[in-house]
């Protein structure tokens, strides 16, 4: 019962596996119909690979199963192999099974055998048709028919692949005496000679390339020397090579900083050194390639000819009788197996002991011949490896030298050109040359030299009291011959009375007339009219300045001046009287210092609030103070030289004067008049 149960379970497993395989086959067939003919080959190959995997799995399952029922007769004429020697044998195996074997899409899954699974091409397989009365058989027959030609072809190809794989595995078994792992009919010397001939061609190509490189390096030397000669700056110095000789070049050279200061004058030296260094490096590279690298490669190429001849001379070492010895070993193996079979099943014709001794002796002889051949291969391969190692190392050494030379040339660009320019001319400010040129050349101003102002100027006797103006303003002077008056701007200084056309001391610098006070006196002035208003004009605003006789030609003359007010006239009269009557210079200094409120050094004193300055301040660079004719106030505000008052042009007034009143000396006094607004003067009636 247990045996039947085991067999039933095995059959059920096979049936389930068969159904899965049939379903998979059906899906594959549908997929194949839907694909184009171009994709059929690829899909078929993938299906075969999947079928092989499924075939191996099912073989494992079938080999573990044992069938006792059913009728499947297979006459197998199998030629078995014992230790690699084919032994003809005939065996009839009868398998009883009530189920047919399953054929999947890849072919026959496997043949169940109780013996060796190896089946050669002489194996005849007969598959019995299932019993028609068997329902299960009918069902399986409907699902998977053996009449399908594609399935049968796949089965045959699968069996052939299995057989070839097993044979290759046996042939590569190092324990089998019927296998020779060493090639017996090979020609390794010819192959190796051809390989080193190819290496000779490679070396020749490298030699041609390096020869052209050497030629190019020679051309680089010529081109770099041309570039070195093209560096021509006639007014720049080149270190250790060139100095300007002409006076013009030397003068132009002074426009730039000297050599070594990072200026543009360093450029010729850097470029010249760069091109000369490249020319020297290219010349060195050409010499090294021509005299060292290329000759070594040529010697190696000539040596390879000798080595190739030596390799070809070793061809006799590979002549062997391994195939002959292998046949004798097979014959001895066959005799040994037959003697052993006869000793087991029938009357022995030969003693297995003796046949085994003969077999072992033949195997040793075969191995000796095989080892001789093996040593020849080892010797050839070792020598070839060493020779090729030398070839490769020489080529590597040559290309390494070439790469080093190129690297040195590339490094020169950085070391001599880029680094020097980067640390020098590239790194300076664009105005570096200009600033140094301006600072060194005496024909230009320093960039940081400020402009001077007039108030910063100091010179000797700058604040001498004799340089100040005492009073200035508009007066009217009567003509010598006519009774008319002409208006002018008068400036009273310690020594002169000057008449100007205008009050602008920037444009009008030359006086129309100048009267020396040392040659003049003030004689009289008009009396103040008590009945007139404070602002009245006329006979009460006149004074006479008498010019003394100077020699025979020049006679004395009375100059009649008219002011716009009595107070202004008295101020002019008093100042003129003191200045004309004072002959001592010290007294004159004292008067000026007190009147203009000057310090001991001659500078005007500041007021208490430090906001206003005496209007009689120094007149620097021949400029004078500007003051209205009404303004005689000592403490009035100072008017700078840059301010030009807007005054009227010369005004002529027709005024007649019959007589001048006597001068009242008691009315002369130093006073500080007020500032008045100038108004038109009415006609004076005598």
UniProtKB/Swiss-Prot annotation:
The modification Phosphoserine is found at residues 145, 150, 153. It is found in: Cell membrane. Keywords: Cell membrane, Coiled coil, Lipid metabolism, Membrane, Phosphoprotein, Sphingolipid metabolism. Its main location: membrane. PROSITE patterns: PH_DOMAIN. Residues 296-381 form a coiled coil. Phosphorylated by the target of rapamycin complex 2 (TORC2) and dephosphorylated by serine/threonine-protein phosphatase 2B (calcineurin). Dephosphorylated in response to the disruption or inhibition of sphingolipid synthesis. PANTHER family: CYTOSKELETAL SIGNALING PROTEIN SLM1 (PTHR31941), PHOSPHATIDYLINOSITOL 4,5-BISPHOSPHATE-BINDING PROTEIN SLM1-RELATED (PTHR31941:SF16). This is Phosphatidylinositol 4,5-bisphosphate-binding protein SLM1. Residues 33-147, 157-176, 626-669 are annotated as: Disordered. Pfam families: BAR_4 (PF20400), PH_20 (PF20399). A motif (PXIXIT-like, required for interaction with CNA1 and CNA2, and calcineurin-dependent dephosphorylation) lies at residues 673-678. GO terms for molecular function: identical protein binding; phosphatidylinositol-4,5-bisphosphate binding; sphingolipid binding. It is a peripheral membrane protein. Changing residue 487 to A: In SLM1-PHM1; reduces phosphoinositide binding by 80% and causes mislocalization to the cytoplasm. In SLM1-PHM2; reduces phosphoinositide binding by 95%. It comes from the Eukaryota. It comes from Saccharomyces cerevisiae (strain ATCC 204508 / S288c).
